[in-house]
């Protein structure tokens, strides 16, 4: 039993969810292949890693240098000796160091132009005289000030160059030279830059030069004095804030304010020494592709300084902890190792994640191209349930996709995944796929063909990765590129995704190279991830809102900027709008009386706002704009008809007459150029979404899901009509029987295996399920055999008791059997309207006599007809067969039979027949007359 209460939001959402669940179950292997794509891509990364390692191992520059020390008789080397003495500078770092040389314990100090200074004293940067700043904090301010004064030595002595390293233990020396990758020579010594002596104050005598030997090289160095400035801060938060703001990206002015060291003395007192030391880990390297080894970082001198300060506090100024040198740990011979996943991770994973975008976009555009979206909407599925269920499906698939990516990547040992916090990664990927889905919904409104959408989507995929890797990353790492423009570039979704992946790769490299923690929540605000998160979240919501708006606009064929126009001028009400059209319309063509009467009836119904008719069309017009220099094409010209419940109104017309355009306007596929129509008192120009809840449609072409069965189609559309439980099952069984799809398990076969006729019958069953109040059928019996066609007609006739049906057809037999009234449509205009008998009586006031004789008796036949009816017309003649149209008012049937029997005595008549005017004759006559009048007009 039909439930005429419109289905609720949840009911429609449930219908779509269950349909999609069944559909995806039938396409399970396609979904599995999509989800396991990350596995193959991760394996590809491993393959690239193996290939890279093979190439690296074959290169002499990536291992310690060797020399052949013994050759055999054939000249082939039998024994090699490897070591520093045989290596180039490139090869040296890969050599074994069983006994590393001692290294000078220098303090890393900032360059003069980057040292932390008060803005009022920044002129020292130009002269190179800025002091070196050391920050100190702790729980005990007095103790902190005391230890600060003890950090730096007030004397400097170099007794002998032969004991230079030992003498260094009594002084604090530093260098502005960044440490290099070498672990046997300190760049602070073998570079041309001077060594700096850090003192509380400087005098001219504190600058000197000396020579010392570090076999096999003798160095000549200049020692310059630089003032050390110890500053107290209230707590570690202030220290952290000052250090962070000292980085170029930590302040809006992009000014570097660097400190040499910082100490938190915590709860240190005379009985306990507890200190935290800050140092600049960025000196370890910039982690670019070409710089994978760890740089030397001068932390030991910072430790020695605070230790000596505490000893002086306890034992007096003469106490010192001697610091002769530092040495690297002995190392074995090594080779270059690069983690490819971390190096190419950003560009590669950008492609991997964005690869879902074409899948989502193609799916959305396919439903629009095949009109599956609109046919669901025509049967009552609103935009809200469609969006909720479709979005949830894409989100579920995308979430499984990224989970598999993280699992597979971690399982095969990719450090990109293993070295970063999984929760941060998941949330980042989750936000990215939500933004990606929202953008796919937004962009889908701009495409009508899958091929075009697919090309654009893959351009976006590859463009995002390539531009990110070769443009965005270059600007990101460039110190001179404004940070504000980086933010602007990140507004492009592909670059915000790339930036997040870039941060993950950098933190993974840092952990690999210097043992840091990787990306953790505690470092979240120190990276650019918080900025990326904010951008993605805001764009996600904005894209979602814009996509929903554009979807509503495109589905209703409205101007995207209609909301702006509505703010300026309020739209008139539907009823007043139709009255205005009535008053302003002028017709210059002569119309038949029946058409004029139908128009007058429509005007009266519109004025009275009557609800007695389910469908009322008022001067409905559709004009398609001209293209390629052609004039505009009028498909429907001011059609006015009214159809009450229980009536089947048939539309006859030649191809191109405008029948399908009329159906498309009534079902919301196209927007009327002018005029309107009321369906159950709802205006199709204003309330189409409400109209859909009481409407059924059988389109000209079958819009079905190939993998769903006939029963599953009816289950889906029945639920949209608010049928439930036993009522739903009963309605489905009755529908299947009425269209002859219930036998031999046909109902449970996929629609893709149906013949054309079976698909047509299923489309009719879909349009009638749930007893809709209005049904549109566009050539419903096309492609059916006679038996199936007759069965289908019976089903349609039985369904029209409380339903208004508008039907288009080329079958006169179908029109006579089903239609209570007919309208003949030619060149976009209604030429006549009435029931089949009235039309035949009105346009068919003649008999058609057909007679076949030999060719020599054709004249005799003509004379016979002229004797019977002087006004008879010959309408057909070929090879002895002639047809004549005889006016009914000039002859009686009995007289005609007598005349033929008499003629048989004079010449041989092979065959003859007399027929009344058929509906086809009426149609041809009206169509020819209308087309002829259009030609002459």
UniProtKB/Swiss-Prot annotation:
Superkingdom classification of source: Eukaryota
Transmembrane segments: 34-54, 340-360, 394-414, 423-443, 455-475, 478-498, 528-548
Disulfide bonds: none
Binding site for ATP: 653-660
Organism this protein belongs to: Arabidopsis thaliana
The encoding gene: ABCA4
Protein family per UniProt: Belongs to the ABC transporter superfamily. ABCA family. CPR flippase (TC 3.A.1.211) subfamily.
Record GO terms (molecular function): ABC-type transporter activity; ATP binding; ATP hydrolysis activity
InterPro entries documented for this protein: AAA+_ATPase, ABC2_TM, ABC_transporter-like_ATP-bd, ABC_transporter-like_CS, ABCA, P-loop_NTPase
GO cellular component: membrane
Topological type in the membrane: Multi-pass membrane protein
Domain ABC transporter residues, every copy: 618-852
Name by which UniProt lists this protein: ABC transporter A family member 4
